[in-house]
Amino acid sequence: MRSEFLLSVALVALNAAGPMTTAASAQLANASASTLGVSGNNTATVRGFGAISVNPAGLAMPGSGFSLAIVPIQVRAGLDPITLSDLAEFDGVLVPTATKEAWLDEITAAGAQAGLVGVDISEFALTFGNIGLQMSTVISIDENLPPGAAEAILFGNAGRTGSAANLSFDGTTVDGFAFTTAGLSVGIPLESSTSDMALGVTVNYTVGNALGIARGTGGILADPVELDVGLAAVFSCEVISEGDGTGCDDLDPMGGTGVGFDLGFMMKQDRFSLGASVSNVVNTFEWDTDKLAYTPASAEFKLGESESSADPEAYSGAPASLKTAVADLTFKPTIQIGAALDVSNDFTVSGDLHNRFSDDGIRLSPKFHLGAGAEFRGLGILHLRGGAAVITDGIQYSGGASLVLGPVNLSAAAAVRTGDLGEVVLGHFALSFGNR
C-alpha cells in the first residue's frame, strides 16, 4: 500500500473528525503578494492595500492613494517531520520498507507527525486617499498523529514487525478554526520639513465562524484484535434534541466576536525609510461558548460486533483541558520594526524584526522573525522580489514577481518556512489595480 496515499487519507479523516485549531499574529490577512515576496520584510515600505494589515501608516505616505485587490488568496500546507517533499519522492510508487522504518523513527523522535493546511482570502481590499478598507477570511487546520497512529498507517495493524501489536492513538489532536475580519485603516500625515512621516491606525471587527478542537485516545489491541478509539471534541454547534438523541442546529457563523486596534508609524527621508507597527494593541476577541458543544465520541470494533457514539452535549460538560484550549484562542500583541534603503530608483532593500509577546494564542506566523528583502523594478513591466528571515527554530525564504500592465497588476509569490510550525509551503496570488 502506498504510504503517501495512506498518510493523506489519515489527514483527511482527521480533518473530517472535527474542525481544527491553529494560531495568527494579526487577524486581517495579508492582501498583498508583495509582502510574501519579500518574506514579510516591508514594515517600512508597504503601500496601498498591503498597508492595511502590515502598517497602516503607509496609507499616508507618498505612493499610496487608490488601490484595489480582487479577491487575493494565500494558501499554506505543511507536514513535519515527514515533509511534503519526502512524500513527493515516492509519488506513484510503493514506499520501500526501509524508508517507512526511517520515517517512523523520525516521527517517534519528534513525538508526532504534524500536518497543517490553511487559506487566507480577502473578499476585498481597497484604499482611497488615506483610508483603507478590507475584509478577509482565514481558515486553518492542523493535526498531530502520535507514533502509534503513524505506525498503523504505514504498516497496518500488524505493525512494523509483521506481528500483531498494541498501537496507541493517545496524543492524536485535530484543531481548526475559521474567522472573518473587517478592518478600517486611516493614515495620518505628520508635518515635517525634512521628511515624509505618518501615523496609522486600524480598527478591526472579528467574527469567529467555526471552531473545533479534538483530542484522540485508544488504539489497536493485538489479542484479541480490537479497535477502540475515543475523540473528545469541542466544536461549533448549538445542541438540539433529535429523535432519541441529540444533534446540531445549523452552524451559527457568529461564533465569537471582538474588536482590535493596530497602530503604525512610518518615515521616509531621501532614500532611507523607517517603519514600526503594533498589531492587537487591544483585542477583545473571544469565542462564544454558548455556541459550542462537546462530544465524547467513541467507537469500538471487535470481531463480529461494533459500537459507536457521537451525540453532542452541552459545552459545560467538556474537560478543563479543552476549555482552556478554547479560552487561549485569542489574538496577542505583535510588534514589527523595519528599515529600508532605496539603493537606486529601481532597487530597494529592506529589513524587519517581528516579535509576538506571547507563546499562546492564535499563531499562524512564527513568534520571532528577523529578516531582509529586496525588490527590483528595473525591468519595466516586471517587478521582482525576494527575501529571507531567521524565524523561531528555523528559517523562511521567498520570492515573487508582479506583471505591471499600466494600472493592472498580476502578482504571485511563494515561500518555504521551517521552524516551530513545521515545514510549511506558502503561495499567494493577487489581481490588483493601483498597487501590488
Label every PLM stretch briefly.
Residues 25-36, 129-436:
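Outer-membrane beta-barrel porins/channels
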Residues 8, 12, 45, 60-61, ...:
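A broad, structure-centric signal for solvent-exposed, well-ordered loop/edge residues
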Residues 20-145, 150:
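N-terminal, post-signal peptide beta-strand-biased segments of exported outer-membrane/organellar beta-barrel
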Residues 2-24:
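Gram-negative bacterial Sec-dependent N-terminal signal peptides
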